[in-house]
């Protein structure tokens, strides 16, 4: 897989829906075959994915929201790489 660029725009793949699930008391990613429960960090990143904003814009917003988090850009990019590998999101 190629390295994620800050200029790329992530979006959820067809069939995937991100939402808060009260019964699980967490954000989840729903897809036809099931559901993925997300931790707070994953939910914070995926909340920013809207199909219009770049990876760089998402990183900047999360850096502003969590200024004490060192290495946040690397963590966000690494998570997005996993999300692409698992076919949750796609990049354009």
From Swiss-Prot:
Pfam families: PqqD (PF05402). Belongs to the PqqD family. One of its GO terms (molecular function) is quinone binding. Keywords: PQQ biosynthesis. Pathway: Cofactor biosynthesis; pyrroloquinoline quinone biosynthesis. Functions as a PqqA binding protein and presents PqqA to PqqE, in the pyrroloquinoline quinone (PQQ) biosynthetic pathway. This is PqqA binding protein. GO terms for biological process: pyrroloquinoline quinone biosynthetic process. Monomer. Interacts with PqqE.
